[in-house]
Amino acid sequence: EEWNFTQLDDILAEHAGEDLIKFLNLIDKMKTLEDYNAIQIRQDHDKATLTTKVSRETFQIDWQQTCKNIHNFVRAYSEVPAAYSILNDKEIKIIRTQMSENKSTLPIGTITDIVKNSHFSVATTDYDLHILEVKNPGKPVMSAASFINGARLKIGDSFGN
């Protein structure tokens, strides 16, 4: 549950080659598709769903979500294109997070805690979300500890749109 999309993609790619070779060997041994006992089912086009158009705003974090939803959103879009939010009028990409069981009374999207040499936390609709890695525009990914030192964060700063 802690893997992000890139890590999962790498793991699947590592094993896909072996499985593909097994599958191709199986097909090579078959005389006809009927030998495979595959059942073909036509798609019911009335039940088909289409995705929405992906835009830049698709990757913006909605802090009005639960801690788990935001954590999973960051995991899904980590690295490329990366989930992002606006902090002090600057776009910050959030690369890695961790769920917590801390609840804050501060407004949603507000920095609730700063743990030097570790992380900072942001209020969500239920629990605080620990931010572990971020990326500033044009800069490499950095730990939250490095970001805290350079950005001069303080409790009460707020992520916005």
What are these regions (language model features)?
Residues 58-161:
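An anion-binding loop in the catalytic cleft
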Residues 1-100:
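Active-site-proximal loop/hinge segments within enzyme catalytic domains
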